[in-house]
Amino acid sequence: IVHNPAVHVHDLSAKELYKSFFGIMNTGRWSRPFSYLSFAVNYHFGGLDVFGYHLVNFTIHCLAAIFLFLLIYQTLELPLLRRDYARHAYSISLMASLLWAVHPIHVSAVTYIVQRMASMAALFYFMAMFFYVKARTSSGSRTRQIIFACCCGISAVMALASKENAAMLPASLFLYEILLIQGYRKESRWAYAAAAAAV
């Protein structure tokens, strides 16, 4: 951040934001543009004062925990799991998301400013999965399902533009679809095993 001129924006004009989003290309690399854009916005409002960066990191982590809660809750409400888990879906989702949020493994992702990239990828990863589930299980109009599907696609792109480990998202959605939405079928167990092994 200190030595990267691409994030040292003077205002929030389209030209300056474009510089931060694509400026890394001038170094011969194009990587994590959405993360660099967030650093640029941070720099615009607070310069190199670390407080603002830590505040944004903490906020992103909290939002990720919220969407993880929503994802788990929606999962436990699926027809395949509802009979066994719907009664305790809220408490299970809350406990699981809280344990994830306070787990020591996330300390560096929250406290190290540059590790915001990992937190942003996690946030948009959870968002993409949540919107996918909503799109697949929504009982509303076709338009509602399309909106959720578009939100899933946008979140997926933002996750990949935050950090490359989000490239595993399609595999996660595939396994989620065949195991939790369509449901495990004994006659297809070898196909499921092969898919899991591939992931």
Annotate each language-model stretch with its function:
Residues 1-199:
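Polytopic membrane enzymes that build or remodel cell-surface glycoconjugates and lipids
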